[in-house]
Design a protein with these regions (language model features):
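Active-site-adjacent helix-turn-beta-strand microarchitecture at beta-sheet edges
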Residues: 1-55, 148-156, 160-163, 182
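Glycine- and other small-residue-rich loops at beta-strand/loop junctions that grip anionic moieties
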Residues: 2, 70, 74, 129
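Feature captures C-terminal
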Residues: 7, 79-201
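Short acidic (Asp/Glu) and glycine-rich catalytic loops that position anionic groups and cofactors
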Residues: 22-27, 59-65, 115-123
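Hard-cation-handling environments
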Residues: 29, 35-111
């Protein structure tokens, strides 16, 4: 359970007369550094990694601040990703899927290919560049926000808010759909509903 399987979920059931009379649930922390690694599994992992080890350990950069993907809206590694999408794709705005995973890096840590891959390892790895009007951008963001914040749990799709680069906005999660986002700005100017923007994702 939890991020990177840091816990075991433990549920104790009190069963009486064929029915659950009571239950208790708790998270049991796993202190991986105190558990001896399984030799067979260690060997298997090393064998599988060996052909890719040099590439995975290639250092791309060194962190200046803590890099993470943990927030519901944005993390510092998310910012690196959307900034890169804007720069590489020549976009005005970038969207990146909202996730809370990957290894957090502390200031001074190397950013290796492996660390980058565990931040971006998803099933739809291609990046795109599309043209979207300001109106469409707001509609997309409103739709995603509704998947998260709809008051009816049957309409909530889970996940996190899409990560956004280049665009600033305010959000009121309790507002109705179509009214959650406001003050959308690109480079300090209001997003123009009628203008077409280049959007990387």
């Amino acid at each position: 359970s939890g991020s990177n399987a840091k816990f075991l979920s433990v549920m104790d059931l009190d069963v009486r007369d064929g029915r659950v009379a009571d239950y208790q649930y708790r998270l049991l922390p796993i202190f991986a550094n105190l558990l001896p690694p399984d030799p067979q599994m260690t060997s298997l992992i090393e064998t599988v990694r060996e052909p890719f080890k040099q590439q995975l350990e290639t250092e791309l950069a060194t962190t200046e601040t803590t890099l993470y993907r943990r927030g519901n809206f944005m993390g510092s590694f998310d910012q690196v990703i959307v900034d890169a999408l804007i720069e590489v794709r020549g976009a005005d705005i970038a969207f990146s899927p909202g996730f809370r995973w990957g290894t957090s890096l502390l200031p001074g840590d190397p950013i290796t290919v492996e660390r980058l891959m565990d931040q971006t390892g998803i099933t739809y790895p291609k990046s795109t560049l599309n043209e979207m009007t300001g109106e469409m951008i707001k509609l997309v963001l409103e739709d995603i926000a509704d998947n998260l914040f709809n008051p009816d749990p049957y309409y909530q799709m889970g996940g996190d808010m899409v990560r956004v680069g280049g665009l600033r906005y305010a959000i009121d999660p309790g507002a109705p759909i179509g009214e959650r986002l406001s003050d959308l700005e690109l480079n300090g100017k209001p997003l123009d509903p009628g203008r077409t923007y280049k959007v990387a994702g």
